[in-house]
C-alpha cells in the first residue's frame, strides 16, 4: 500500500506501532515517516489506537504529507475512529491506508467496528490467514475509487513472486 502512494521524500503519517512491513516499505520507497504515538492502557499495558486529535496535530504540522496509515484494529483488537481519520485526511488531500491484518472479521458483521473500506479508506490490506481461517500468507488488498488500480498492480508485480501458490490463490 505504501509503495502505491508514496515516493522518495513523501511524508506519511502512521502510528509508532506499525508492522515491520510498513517500515520496510518506507525504506524501499524513501518515504519519511511522521509518527503518531498511540497511548498505552496503563492497566493492560497495551497500545491503543490513534487518537483523532493526535492525527489532526500531525496533519497540521505536516500538511505536505500524502497519506495516513491506520491499524484497524491493532494487534490487540483496538480500533481507532477510522471514519473521523478518513474524513480529516481526505479534507487535506491525503490518502488513507488501513492495515487490517487483524480485521478480517470487520467485513462480516453489522455489530462490529467499521472496516476501513466502509469508512472510506483508499486502500486496505487484510490478512486472511490471521483471522479469516485461510492458509498462511494469504491476504487481500482492497482498492477504493480514486486509487489507480493499474499502478497498484505494477507495484505488486515488483514486490511479489512470479510463482504464486495456487493453494493461496484458490
Regions found by a protein language model. Name each.
Residues 1-170:
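Conserved PLP-enzyme active-site core in the AAT-like
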